[in-house]
Amino acid sequence: MRCLFCRSDDTKVIDSRTSEDGISIRRRRECQLCKRRFSTLETASLTVIKRNGTSEPFRREKVVTGVHKACQGRPVTKADLAVLAQRVEESLRASGNSQVDSNDIGLAILPELLRLDQVAYIRFASVYQDFDSLEDFSRAVERLKNQ
């Protein structure tokens, strides 16, 4: 790591701490040449490969937005959705891949949403899994009943 002040490559890590969300690491560093201290925040990037082949950085806000519609009229708070998005991101990062398909995001959302609200789960699953008949809904409800 280069010193922000004198541009020397000779720096030493004094302290490292994981952020509260567990996604980034804050490091306190000291330049061995000028002795000044500075902090860095390090995160591993997570890229989403969309269905059309384009890529974009993972954003929790998109998870919240996608799940919000399924939760309308349900007893689900914004804080609940924020926690769900954090868990989804943690699950995706735990896979060890720096790139994930948009399909993987949907698969990571389903169990978290099921834990949060069964009706919202059915709503989200009906769109995500492209339900096109009453039988699709019935099978999904039966699976929930049998759990």
UniProtKB/Swiss-Prot annotation:
InterPro entries membership: ATP-cone_dom, NrdR-like_N, RNR_NrdR-like
A Pfam cross-reference name: ATP-cone
Annotated cofactor note: Binds 1 zinc ion.
Cofactor(s) the record lists: Zn(2+)
Annotated keywords: ATP-binding, DNA-binding, Metal-binding, Nucleotide-binding, Repressor, Transcription, Transcription regulation, Zinc, Zinc-finger
Domain ATP-cone: 46-136
Name listed for the protein in its UniProt record: Transcriptional repressor NrdR
